[in-house]
Amino acid sequence: MKQRTIAKNVDIVGIGLHKGVPVKMRLEPLDSDMGIIFYRSDAGVTIPVKKEFVVDTKMATVIGKDGVVISTIEHLLSAIYAYGIDNLRIVLDNDEVPVLDGSSAGYCMLIEEAGIKELEKSKKAIKIKKEIEITTEDGKRVTLKPSDRIVYDFEINFEHPAIGKQKFHFDYSIEEYKNNISRARTFGFLHEVQYLRSIGLAQGGSMENAIVLDKTKVLNPEGLRFDDEFVRHKILDAIGDMALLEYTLVGEYDAVAGSHHLNHLLTKKLYEDEANYEIIDLEEASSEASVFEMAYSKVES
């Protein structure tokens, strides 16, 4: 199995979630072994998608270098990672990725518009060898477990009548991601949005790019795309955060009330001990390669 990039440049214009200002973004193909990189054209700074460059995880995943940051990268990275793209340059003229409709569906469409191109060098993956876990005193947990498959399990429990307790199990394939994960939107509570706006954040947030809830119900007139859209979006976010591993994951991700911050701690902990993982060549590891071949096949046939 070979590394992948996109076949041609594609452009999109949108607004950033927090500043609410317009941003132009272009996806550009890259050669083998270049990885996923962001380039801030207004600042002339390149920032690789690596855990070492994560500078903030409170409201979103933010990477930075030399005082230049790029915020809210997780939805775009989720689509890139789900489509198995290994090498890509993302050019932005501002410090936030466009929020689009609050999901990653628009990014899936953009990638499909660009097309997928196989490169010459073999694709690599990171295979989990030992279970690792991050926990908190209030019961939150994120875990990576050994598996020959690519699986995401997530559980949330909100004391809100429109959310409550939700679980979702995702067996990875591009088709399943596109149909069942990518369309799930980010969500927030009205009182939180009002507070964030009072401190200069969420300026671009609206019911056009997020699910908004008051104390009892969903305020969006169109309602939900899935009954369990909230937990599906948490999986979307987790996939985007796992892109910071730099290699495609082979293993099981399992979370209870996970977050960007816990995901970042998990990726750091994984790399602390080489016994936790193995970097495998998918030209040589036929059983693992077959998992990806099946995952890629339906949407590309």
Curated annotation (Swiss-Prot):
Q: Give the UniProt keywords, A-Z.
A: Hydrolase, Lipid A biosynthesis, Lipid biosynthesis, Lipid metabolism, Metal-binding, Zinc
Keyword Flavoprotein appears in the UniProt entry: no
Tell me the GO molecular function terms: metal ion binding; UDP-3-O-acyl-N-acetylglucosamine deacetylase activity
The Gene Ontology biological process annotation of the record reads: lipid A biosynthetic process
Top-level EC class: hydrolase
Any one cellular component term from GO for this entry? membrane
- Hydrolase in keyword set: yes
For activity, the cofactor(s) needed are: Zn(2+)
**Alphabetical list of Pfam families matching this protein:** LpxC
What does the entry list as the binding residues for Zn(2+)? 75, 233, 237
Q: Which pathway is this protein assigned to?
A: Glycolipid biosynthesis; lipid IV(A) biosynthesis; lipid IV(A) from (3R)-3-hydroxytetradecanoyl-[acyl-carrier-protein] and UDP-N-acetyl-alpha-D-glucosamine: step 2/6
Tell me the protein family, please: Belongs to the LpxC family.
Write out the function statement from the record: Catalyzes the hydrolysis of UDP-3-O-myristoyl-N-acetylglucosamine to form UDP-3-O-myristoylglucosamine and acetate, the committed step in lipid A biosynthesis.
| PANTHER family listed in its UniProt record | UDP-3-O-ACYL-N-ACETYLGLUCOSAMINE DEACETYLASE 1, MITOCHONDRIAL-RELATED
Protein name in UniProt: UDP-3-O-acyl-N-acetylglucosamine deacetylase
- Give the encoding gene's name: lpxC
